[in-house]
Curated annotation (Swiss-Prot):
Optimum temperature is 37 degrees Celsius. This is 2',3'-cyclic-nucleotide 3'-phosphodiesterase. GO terms for biological process: adult locomotory behavior; axonogenesis; cyclic nucleotide catabolic process; oligodendrocyte differentiation; response to toxic substance. It is found in: Membrane; Melanosome. It comes from Bos taurus. It comes from the Eukaryota. The lineage of its organism: Eukaryota, Metazoa, Chordata, Craniata, Vertebrata. The modification Phosphoserine is found at residues 149, 207, 338. Its EC number is 3.1.4.37. Belongs to the 2H phosphoesterase superfamily. CNPase family. GO terms for molecular function: 2',3'-cyclic-nucleotide 3'-phosphodiesterase activity; RNA binding. A lipid is attached at residue 397 (S-farnesyl cysteine). Substrate binds at residues 232, 311.
Length: 400
């Protein structure tokens, strides 16, 4: 099937099919495309276009191949067990693009798939056909291969009428960009830990009855994000968070879903609680940035995008949400006229002491990282991270 024919079809207008930068960027990621939709709505056609576009390193797993009739999963427990085993085997083989073709109309089923994606460090993209008849049961009755009646189709419809919202939306870095930023962050921690100005301020990082001459910051920030790094835009809590539905329904969010972006990193920072990278958002990226997240208090009037960051690590008992709060406190201080004291030069730029155990490395040359805008749909809890390589299994990590 030629993907050139996709350009003229409105139902195939997705960035991952039409935007060449996105196609190239997805080649550097591990992505699980989960198709959702009623039988006859065009899922299988869409799945074939995705496979055709990405070719090598791509695998499709289709419920049709297991003779699963769309509907309640209970009647096909053995078939689904086999499908899931085959899907996990594909994950272990590190296919860059996996396509799962099924109705996926039940939340419980989706949650199983999200957990699998977490275990093998795949980013998830939910895809629904854009065909005009996708929710028209009268038309679907004629189009579906299973000869399901309109009443059968109506029973499946409620789970597909509303968008499934993630825990949060954000830009997820490619494996290559993630590794490069991670390495830069680790070097910063090592250099900062050895710097004489930092050693004078150790009291912010150790308790008073613990005399120390040095601290290993790489170990101190031991709570690390597994897999690829990300920059959160909107925390949705699966639709329960304030403003989540409104954010997800914005045209710019829908059009940008699974689209490639290049993010600019201007600085790295350390506080007694977190370490992260400061992200400078372009005008195009600010269009995806919520209006209400750049405040610590209602009276704050900080520049839009002030909170944009990538968490690189947290101290033991600290949650990842703290990284953005720490950055906002730094920006608030800057807005008040204090950029801190320049205390030296590290390999990547100038080092500033901001007081209270806070440090900023202003990068002499800003870093550019490639990322995909999508959602994180997992539980955000510790999961056993599995490697695609034989015998490779990592310890449980917390998604942050």
């Amino acid at each position: 099937m030629s993907s050139s024919g996709a350009k003229d079809k409105p139902e195939l207008q997705f960035p991952f099919l039409q935007d060449e930068e996105t196609v190239a960027t997805l080649q550097e990621c591990k992505t699980l495309f989960i198709l959702r939709g009623l039988p006859g709505s065009g899922k299988s056609t869409l799945a074939r276009f995705i496979v055709d576009k990405y070719r090598d390193g791509t695998k499709m797993v289709s419920a049709d191949s297991y003779k699963i009739t769309p509907g309640a999963r209970g009647s096909f427990s053995e078939e689904y067990k086999q499908l899931d085993e085959d899907l996990a085997a594909c994950c272990r083989r590190d296919f860059r693009v996996l396509v799962l073709d099924d109705t996926n109309h039940e939340r419980e089923r989706l949650e199983q798939l999200f957990e699998l994606a977490d275990q093998y460090q795949y980013q998830v993209v939910l895809v629904e056909p854009k065909t005009a008849w996708r929710l028209d049961c009268a038309q679907l009755k004629e189009k579906n291969q299973w000869q399901l009646s309109a009443d059968d189709l109506k029973k499946l419809k409620p789970g597909l009428e509303k968008d499934f919202l993630p825990l949060y939306f954000g830009w997820f870095l490619t494996k290559k960009s993630s590794a490069a930023l991670w390495k830069t962050g680790q070097t910063f921690l090592e250099e900062l830990g050895n710097h004489k100005a930092f050693k004078k301020e150790l009291r912010h990082f150790v308790s008073g009855d613990e005399p120390r001459e040095k601290i290993e910051l790489v170990t101190y920030f031991g709570k690390r994000p597994p897999g690829v790094l990300h920059c959160t835009t909107k925390f949705c809590d699966y639709g329960k968070a304030a403003g989540a539905e409104e954010y997800a329904q914005q045209d710019v969010v829908k059009k940008s879903y699974c689209k490639a972006f290049t993010l600019t990193i201007s600085a790295l920072f350390v506080t007694p609680k977190t370490t992260g990278a400061r992200v400078e958002l372009s005008e195009q990226q600010l269009a995806l940035w919520p209006n209400d997240v750049d405040k610590l208090s209602p009276s704050d009037n900080l520049p839009r995008g002030s909170r944009a960051h990538i968490t690189l690590g947290c101290a033991g008992d600290v949650e990842a949400v703290q990284t953005g709060i720490d950055l906002l406190e730094i920006v608030r201080q800057e807005k008040g006229g204090s950029r801190g004291e320049e205390v030296g030069e590290l390999s990547r730029g100038k080092l500033y002491s901001l007081g209270s155990g806070r440090w900023m490395l202003s990068l002499a040359k800003k870093m550019e990282v490639r990322a995909i805008f999508t959602g994180y749909y997992g539980k955000g809890k510790a999961v056993p991270i599995r490697s695609g390589r034989k015998g490779g299994s990592f310890q449980s990590c917390t998604i942050i």
